[in-house]
Amino acid sequence: MAKLLCSYLFICMFVLSGFLVFSSAKQLKTCTSVIKLGHPCDIESCLNECFRVYNTGFATCRGDKYSQLCTCEYNC
């Protein structure tokens, strides 16, 4: 009976510690910025400009090919 109780307590401690680590993990914030290019927006030049300006490891771009405005999303 004592072995069963110790095993149960060990499993509960393991699950609780995993939950605490998961809940306290820092989440990445995503920021959005508008980049004005001198030519119609294309994804490649938007990504290059976003990486150059914000120096981040993650970036996505949106925009249309008729507008000179591109929307850049990056990790803050």
Curated annotation (Swiss-Prot):
- Which cysteines pair up through disulfides? They are 31-76, 41-61, 46-70, 50-72
* Keywords (A to Z) from UniProt: Antimicrobial, Disulfide bond, Fungicide, Plant defense, Secreted, Signal
Point out the signal peptide segment.
Answer: 1-25
A Gene Ontology biological process noted in the UniProt record is: defense response to fungus
Instruction: Supply one GO CC term from the record.
Output: extracellular region
Name the family.
Belongs to the DEFL family.
User: Cross-referenced PANTHER family, in alphabetical order?
Assistant: DEFENSIN-LIKE PROTEIN 163-RELATED, DEFENSIN-LIKE PROTEIN 184-RELATED
Name this polypeptide is given: Defensin-like protein 164
Q: What is the organism of origin for this protein?
A: Arabidopsis thaliana (Mouse-ear cress)
The lineage, from the top, is:
Eukaryota, Viridiplantae, Streptophyta, Embryophyta, Tracheophyta
Q: Which gene encodes it?
A: LCR38
